[in-house]
Amino acid sequence: MDHNAFSEITPDIVRLAKMSEQADIINSELFTKYDVKRGLRDLNGKGVLAGLTHISDVRATETVNGISVPAHGELFYRGYNVKDLVEGFTSGNRFGFEEVTYLLLFDKLPDEKELTDFRALLSKYRSLPTSFVRDIIMKAPSSDMMNTLARSVLTLYSYDDRADDVSLPNVLRQCLQLISLFPLLSIYGYQAYCHYHDGKSLFIHQSLPELSTAENILHLLRPDSSYTPLEAKLLDIALVLHMEHGGGNNSSFTTHVVTSSLTDTYSVIAAAIGSLKGPRHGGANIKVVQMFEDMKKEVKNWEDEDEVANYLKRLLHKDAFDHAGLIYGVGHAIYSKSDPRAVIFKSYVEKLSEEKGLQKEFALYSLVERLAPQIISNERQMYKGVSINVDFYSGFVYHMLDLPMQLYTPIFAMARISGWAAHRMEELANNGKIIRPAYKPIGEDKVYINISDRK
């Protein structure tokens, strides 16, 4: 079977798909009748309580006179405000990814020796099995780097003599190896695709033990391995801001769900990758960049507030860009007044825009940040406030770093693997039951019909 035949949607498939859709549609009123929390969230977007965690805390409300009201968002890793963590390692002129990974896994900020030893351990694990690049990554490269990453993770199972051992020491070893290997798996997969599909020169850099994770990403990706200190610093901050966001986000909850079945680490992380790949989860920053590229073509004067506002209204009316009715990068399931990750990001983003000569683009982003919340509030029925989220600026950062769009979501995964690892360890340590929520059957009982009597 050739590739085109494999991918073909025949008239029979279209017909059967319509039958399937008709059989599966559920009257939306029934969800209200049976008080189903669709998406495991209530009408205000608050998640149903499904578990407990030490790892992080997402705060977006405060209590005033006994009433919960929206507040500026805060994010805590193991009890530490992320804002303080970022200020701490940047003021100390350190890279933070390894330090904060240590915190997430062990509930402790490392001292200098502990941090040095941990970095050395991650560096030791930053090496793929012999011939893995040639035999696995270079064969049948996918156009989607998240699929490539998931395939590589699942294949590593075959190289692990203790792949199915779910004891905590073994799982920690596997998680640390995957944290170290994600940049290599993602970037090598991208290089292979560019070579075989786009005809570009193939270059494979080896990781360098003296470099941080952020520095290694830029070193591995760029042909000349060069980068500025500000570029590496901002990518490191991006990794820290994306590495964890509670146990209820889709990929971390997937990690808990699949871990609860006591399957192996590679299967768990591959499932989390599949979750993060979805455009409702990890792919949003790509949409932000694409939306702004369309905006820059459609809006003649980027400084004209009325013209920019009109474009944003057209987005909401499904009359611009992808006609989805969304302003990408604005709004969040939990945060309403502000996303702390976006707030932290913005000052560093402005510095990089100055270094790259992209001040006009930054000014346009800032203008949309100011206009969009009010326009959404005027145009839509809102149950809570709305503000920009971390995706709003992260795509712009990756664009300024000349990172290919195909790697935007894998870079999210390079960060979030630390959070997934912490959640997997937490689920195993507490030895909970397999996660199995209820689904209410609403179909009618039927009497069996012999095949000769069916119509």
Give the residues covered by each predicted segment.
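Non-transmembrane, aqueous-exposed alpha-helical and coiled segments at domain scale
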Residues: M1-K455
